[in-house]
Amino acid sequence: MTPLRSGIVAAVAALIADQASKLWLLFVFDIGHRGAVRVTPFFDLVLAWNTGISYGWFQTDSPVGATILLAIKAGAVVLLAIWMARSQTRLATIGLGLIIGGAIGNAIDRFAYGAVVDFVLFHVPLAGKTYSWYVFNLADVAIVAGVIALLYDSFLRTPAAKAP
């Protein structure tokens, strides 16, 4: 399998996993009516509608703001796809594919629902307080894994020979 094909497979896999998990939680498990569900002492399934970007930054309920965020995301996906098509290493193309698949998954949510569906909440009770991370989804996991793959690939690559 060529590196580009590996990246495309990663993008499609990330997109399918993300959308399947969200559709199942929303329409089969019906998390909207059930409310938060404790899965383990440190992990809950919750429903959070994120109208902003990462970590809830730039929250917007206006159609103009949502359109701007979608346009920025579409532009980023196009640039990432060009980078992926030109990439020479399998790890980089897989990383870029994961980022693209995650970005498209979240963009589908924003287009379909007006917000991104987040549902994973990790928390740790410590010294009488509960510390928690932001609520996220599988698209976010794919994006982070893709960035880690790109960073790892950049450290693995052998430096080009210096010109004489």
UniProtKB/Swiss-Prot annotation:
Does this entry carry the keyword NADP?
no
UniProt keywords (A-Z) are: Aspartyl protease, Cell inner membrane, Cell membrane, Hydrolase, Membrane, Protease, Transmembrane, Transmembrane helix
EC class of the enzyme, as a word: hydrolase
Tell me where it resides.
Cell inner membrane
* GO biological process assignments: proteolysis
Recorded catalytic activity of this chain's protein = Release of signal peptides from bacterial membrane prolipoproteins. Hydrolyzes -Xaa-Yaa-Zaa-|-(S,diacylglyceryl)Cys-, in which Xaa is hydrophobic (preferably Leu), and Yaa (Ala or Ser) and Zaa (Gly or Ala) have small, neutral side chains
* Residues at the active site: D118, D140
One of the record's GO molecular function terms: aspartic-type endopeptidase activity
In the bilayer, the protein is annotated as:
Multi-pass membrane protein
Q: Name one Pfam family in it.
A: Peptidase_A8
Q: Does the keyword Ribonucleoprotein apply?
A: no
Q: Which residues cross the membrane?
A: 8-28, 39-59, 64-84, 91-111, 131-151
Known EC number: 3.4.23.36
InterPro entries noted in UniProt: Peptidase_A8 (IPR001872)
Q: A GO CC term?
A: plasma membrane
The Swiss-Prot or TrEMBL record describes its family as follows: Belongs to the peptidase A8 family.
Summarize the protein's role. Answer: This protein specifically catalyzes the removal of signal peptides from prolipoproteins.
State the name under which the record lists this protein.
Lipoprotein signal peptidase
Native source organism of the sequence: Nitrobacter hamburgensis (strain DSM 10229 / NCIMB 13809 / X14)
- Record gene name: lspA
